[in-house]
Amino acid sequence: KASVEFISEEYDLALIKVDEPGFFNGTVPLKFSGIPMNRDKVAIYGYPMGGDKLSITEGIVSRIEHSKYTLTTEKFLIGQTDAAINPGNSGGPVISKGKVVGVAFSGLLGADNIGYFIPTPIVEHFLNDIKDGNYDGMPKLGIIWSELESPSHRKMLGVENTSTGILIKKIKKNSPLENMLKKGDVLLKLDNYSIEYDGTVEFRKNERTDFNYVVQSKNFGELLRYEIMRDKK
């Protein structure tokens, strides 16, 4: 017998409690690792197609990026692999070098050897979130923004000598930045991450992803620093 303790539709994750005494006897917990590198080998464990024997498929990490999950319009960090992920594999661990680097997420219909997994930072965020007995979800800036690719537009805003900065077009109601930023500001940095004009940050050397990577590394109540350009200052 098992019961669902917590569920996150935005992450497509759930925490399940097994009530049977001794269910985990003889097992050893798997340790989490960080985000795998491109070309790292991975193995995905699961029970596809309703089988009763453990299936292991192997492949490599193709890319790490931000993309939409199944049940949300928000983009979160996601890993892509050429290891087969079939129905029934979802929720299985993705293992690299003996440690968990993610949770099998889905395959792309109509495409062979393309599967996706939820990287451990998202899984850990979910687990840390529910430690207090409540699920709060992922923090959001609550802004509408646009890229600043045009040299003339950048000059008008005072950021012509750098490639960083995105234009704030609107602050949504109840945004944590509602009384701090305003329309027309140029958002330059979050914490120590410079935001490129296309809205990306370098999350590790020579690899970029959506600037929300920085926001989504936080839990509610944690400090997030920002740097802006306003009126060319």
Language-model regions, residue ranges each:
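Conserved active-site neighborhood of the chymotrypsin/trypsin-like protease fold
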Residues: 1-54, 87, 111
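Beta-strand/loop subdomains of soluble extracytoplasmic proteins
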Residues: 1-3, 37-43, 54-67, 121-124, ...
